[in-house]
């Protein structure tokens, strides 16, 4: 998820260079088209799908399409995410819920959709992109830090619950990486 640009695109490109077939999604067709163009420019044949990963029915439908059109999902990278840099007391509950929905609920929904096929295949890998904010927190990122902290624990629970099916689930908690999403913060805090 979230592999049209930025960290997700870099991860998918590295995986493609190791022989993986790349399948990605984004919430809008124009973003899928941009992603497909970027993969083509990089010499990678990728498959793109439009899907709102916070919508369980849409995710289940997308996973069915991918399995039918491309094949089994052996590796899932849950990378889609958003951040709202708003002081906590200025953030509305709706804004807080939106971040939790994309950064925590969506990885749950997508993992839940692919795990049955992974069990049937005899295993698989799930990689959740967490964040150093899951450990640290910082001003103006309360929803993001809460979501990534929850994702870290979800990762541990998936690993514990589905390891017996040869499904490994790991989290990666990168620090600040220069992407369009982190550009506003770099302007405010150039030292990270």
Regions found by a protein language model. Give the residues of each.
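Canonical Rossmann dinucleotide-binding motif of NAD(H)/NADP(H)-dependent dehydrogenases/reductases
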Residues: 1-22
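Active-site helix of classical SDR
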Residues: 111, 147, 155
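Residue(s) in the substrate-gating loop at a strand-loop-helix junction
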Residues: 131
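A glycine/serine/threonine-rich, flexible loop-to-helix segment
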Residues: 164, 176-192
């Amino acid at each position: 998820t979230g592999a049209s640009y930025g960290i997700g695109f870099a991860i998918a490109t590295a995986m493609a260079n190791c022989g993986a077939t790349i399948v990605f999604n984004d919430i809008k067709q124009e973003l899928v088209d941009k992603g497909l163009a970027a993969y083509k420019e990089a010499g990678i044949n990728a498959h793109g799908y439009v899907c709102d990963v916070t919508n369980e029915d849409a995710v289940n439908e997308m996973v069915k399409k991918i399995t039918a059109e491309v094949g089994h999902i052996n590796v899932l990278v849950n990378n889609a995410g958003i951040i709202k840099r708003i002081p906590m007391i200025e953030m509305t509950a709706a804004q807080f819920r939106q971040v939790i929905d994309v950064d925590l609920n969506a990885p749950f929904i997508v993992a839940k959709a692919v795990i049955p096929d992974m069990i049937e295949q005899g295993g698989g890998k799930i990689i959740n992109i967490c964040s150093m904010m899951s450990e640290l927190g910082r001003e103006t990122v309360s929803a993001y830090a809460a979501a990534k902290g929850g994702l870290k624990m979800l990762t541990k629970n998936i690993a514990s619950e589905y390891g017996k099916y040869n499904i490994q689930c790991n989290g990666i908690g990168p620090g600040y990486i220069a992407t369009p999403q982190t550009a506003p913060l770099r302007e405010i805090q150039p030292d990270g």
